[in-house]
């Protein structure tokens, strides 16, 4: 089931933040920028999803985290002012200056953006490529709301012999978050 079909921008942001690798010391500033970036992107994407302009999935999120696409998303004409302000503020934490062409942005912008973007590379790659058949489905077969409301038994199998413990933990977090 695609956990990004439903849910608020904040809930989906927290789902992705929970998959970030731990950072400490000097790297915590980059982790903070990564959280700001994914928050801004999720507010914009959820806004477009709720307007029926796109079906949100892990591949859409991963594609939207490319520098040029993220800037284009910040300038999307269909965004609400709040969503636009959120993603533009997130880009601003990496040095983006609104109103300037990409070629006129500060040289450090692309570098700082890349650091923030890299925090989600592994998780989104895993969800989009390895588990596309599960999390990439636009309309999944499992209705988690029905399972909860009708008190049905739902079993999620994790490939414990085939994956590293950290990968299994990520899959478990995603499954639990999808149920919420």
Regions found by a protein language model. Name each.
Residues 1-180:
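P-loop NTPase motor domains
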């Amino acid at each position: 089931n695609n956990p990004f079909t439903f849910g608020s921008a904040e809930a989906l942001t927290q789902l992705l933040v929970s998959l970030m690798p731990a950072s400490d010391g000097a790297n915590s500033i980059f982790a903070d920028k990564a959280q700001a970036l994914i928050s801004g992107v999720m507010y914009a994407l959820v806004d477009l999803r709720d307007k029926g302009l796109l079906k949100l999935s892990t591949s859409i999120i991963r594609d939207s985290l490319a520098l040029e696409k993220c800037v284009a998303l910040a300038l999307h004409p269909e965004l609400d002012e709040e969503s636009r302000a959120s993603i533009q503020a997130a880009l601003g934490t990496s040095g983006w200056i609104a109103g300037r062409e990409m070629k006129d942005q500060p040289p450090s912008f692309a570098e700082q953006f890349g650091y923030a973007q890299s925090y989600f590379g592994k998780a989104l790659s895993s969800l989009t490529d390895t588990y596309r058949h599960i999390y990439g489905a636009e309309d999944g077969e499992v209705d988690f709301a029905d399972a909860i409301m009708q008190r049905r038994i739902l079993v999620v199998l994790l490939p414990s012999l085939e994956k590293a413990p950290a990968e299994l933990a990520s899959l478990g977090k995603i499954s639990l978050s999808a149920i919420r």
